Amino acid sequence: MRKLALRDEILLQIDKAARYIGGEVNAVMKNKDDVDIRFAMAFPDVYEIGMSNLGMMILYDMFNKRDDVWCERLFSPWTDLDKIMREEKIPLFTLESQDPVKEFDFLGITLGYEMCYTNVLQLLDLSGIPFRAAERVEDDPLVIGGGACAYNPEPLAEFFDLFYIGEGETVYGALFDAYKANKKAGGSRQDFLLKAAQIPGIYVPSLYEVTYKEDGTIESFRSKHADVPEKVEKQLIIDMDRDYNKLEAPVVPHIKATQDRVTLEIQRGCIRGCRFCQAGMIYRPTRERDVETLKESARIMLKNTGHEEISLSSLSSSDYSQLKEIVNFLIDEFRDEAVNISLPSLRIDAFALDVMSKVQDVKKSSLTFAPEAGSQRLRNVINKGLTEEDILHGAGEAFKGGWNQVKLYFMLGLPTETEDDMKGIAHLAQKIAETYYEVVPKEQRRGKVQINVSTSFFVPKPFTPFQWAPMFREEDFIEKAKVVKNEIRSQLNQRSIRYNWHEPDVTVLEGFLARGDRRCSKVILKAYEKGALYDAWSESFRYDIWKEAFKETGVDIEFYTLRERSTDEILPWDFIDAGVTKKFLIREWEQAKAETVTPNCRQKCSGCGVLKYKGGVCCESKN
C-alpha cells in the first residue's frame, strides 16, 4: 500500500484533500525500479482544472504506454496546503507514487494560460528546484514546457531548460530516446540539452542569445552553437487516425472536475481565419478524425470511465464534416443510459436544427454563440465571416428548436473599433430578443427569452494577424464596457438582456505576458516573491503586487501593451516556425485594416503556408 505524502491531520485541515491523494480509477501505477525515465507531468492550477485538460490526459496516457517511462501527475497546491508545505518543509510530490518531484528525471509543465505563470514558479519553489535553469545542477529534474503559451516561451525562458513546440505526440519519443542514450553514455545535463536542441520542435533557451537596440526592441536572436538550428519548427501529426494517441481510459477524478465528462476530440485546427484567434493559426491545418474511429472511442471511454456526458471537442465543432453522423450515433447508441451530448464551439450560422433538436431531447441547456463583434464592419475586420442575417437566422432556428436562453460572447478593444461598433453589441442582442418573440408562437414559449451578453477585452497574441496591434489601458477598457452597458439599458427588451464583462487589469497583464520577451521574467519572479499566485483566479489576483513588481524591476508594461509594432520589427517569437508565414500574417493585418474578408480553407487557399505539411483540410492540397 502506498504511503501518502501528507499526514492524516494535514488532510483533515485542508480543503478538498482528495486533490492530493491519487489512486483514481485508471491512474497508472508502475514499479519505479522497472523504468528508465520518471516524468512528473504538472499543471499550474488546481486539480479540478488540470484534470479537465485533454492535452495533459493524452500525453499521460501516451507516455505510460512506454514500458521504460512512468509518467505521474501533479497540480498546484491550493493556498491552504501551500502554506502548510512551506511551514513543515514538505516537498511537492506526484499523485501516483507520492514521491518528491525532485527525484524525477523530468518535470513537464503545461502552459495553457499566461495568468498561470506565477503558479509555474510555485511548482518549482515547492519542489526545491532552482527558479533559473542556469542555476540547476546535474541531479535536478529537467524542466520542460509545452502548450499554446510555448509559442512565445520567452517570458519564461529563464525558468525552463527546454520547451517543445507543437503537438507532443511527435516530439517526446525522440526526446526520451535521446535522454536514455545520453544517460547510458555518461553524458552531462548540458550534453543532453545540446542533443535535445537538434530534435525538431525542441527549443533550449540557454543555447540562444538575444540582443536589444537602444529603443528596447530586439536587435538579434541567434543560436550559440553551430549544431543548433536558428529556427524551431512546430511539430504536428497529420493523420489523426493513424498517428493519434487513442485515449481509451482517461483518469476519473476523485472530485468533480471543471469538465467532468468524456472528451472526444473530433478534429484539430480550424478552417476559419479569425484574425484575433491564436489557436486557429497555430493549430493549422485542420485535421479531422474519422467518424468510425470516434464511435469506437466513445464506446470504450464511456465504458471505462462511467461518465454520463460526452463532449465533442474542437475549435469549431460545426465545421466537422461528419458532425450529424457522430451526433446521431451518440444519441441513439447511449439513449438508454441518458448520456448527455455537449456541443461546444458552435458557429451560429452552421448549427443544424435537426442536430440541435436531438441534443435537446436528451437534456435542455442554454446555447452559446460568439459573434465577437457587434457590427458587420468590425466582424469583417476580424474575419469572423458572419453576417447579421446569419446570426439572426441561426438564433431563430435555435428558438424554434425549443431554446429560450442564449449566451453571446463579444470582445471589446479590437483594432479599428468605434463607439458605433460597441453600441452594436446592444443592438444585436435586442434584435436576437425580438427574433424570439417573432418566430416562437406565444403558446409554445417556455417563458421569457434570456440573452446573456458577455464581453472580454481583446488581447493581441503571437502568430495572429493582430500580433502587431496595440492594446488599451485599464481605464479605457472600463469606458468601453460602460458604453455597452448604457446602450443595453436603452433597449426595449433590456430586462431580457444581462451583461457582464471581464476584469480589465487581468487583461492588460495577460497582454504583457503574451507578447513579452526574456526581460519579462524578472517581473514574473519579483511578483511571485512578493506574493502573486493564482492570478487566473479573481479572488486571488493582486494587481497591486504586479504594479510594485514593474516599479522595482524598472520594466515598462506599456512598452509591451500600448505600442503598435512595426511589421519590420523582430518579435520575440519570430524564431519559431508555426506553419503560418509572417508574409501571410502581414497580408491579413493589412486586409483587416481594409475590412476585407478572407475565405475559409474549404473555399479558397489563402496561402498561409501550411501546405508544406501536405495534409489536412486545405482546398489546394487536394488538387
Residue ranges of each PLM-predicted region?
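N-terminal pre-triad scaffold of radical SAM enzymes
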Residues: M41-D45, F63, V251-Q278, L302, ...
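Low-complexity, highly charged intrinsically disordered N-terminal segments
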Residues: F39-P44, G50-E72, P77-M85, K89, ...
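Radical SAM enzyme core and accessory elements
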Residues: M1-V28, D33, F39-M41, S490-N623
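Canonical Radical SAM [4Fe-4S] cluster-binding loop centered on the CxxxCxxC motif
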Residues: N53, I255-E292, G607-K622
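Conserved SAM/AdoMet-binding glycine-rich loop
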Residues: M41-V46, M115, R299-K407, L412-N452, ...
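Flexible loop/turn segments at secondary-structure boundaries
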Residues: Y47-G50, T79-D82, M115-Y117, A150-P153, ...
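Glycine-rich beta-alpha loop elements in corrinoid/cobalamin-binding modules
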Residues: S76-R222, P465-D517, I524-E539
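N-terminal [4Fe-4S]-dependent radical SAM core
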Residues: I10-A40, Y47-E48, P205, T211-T263, ...
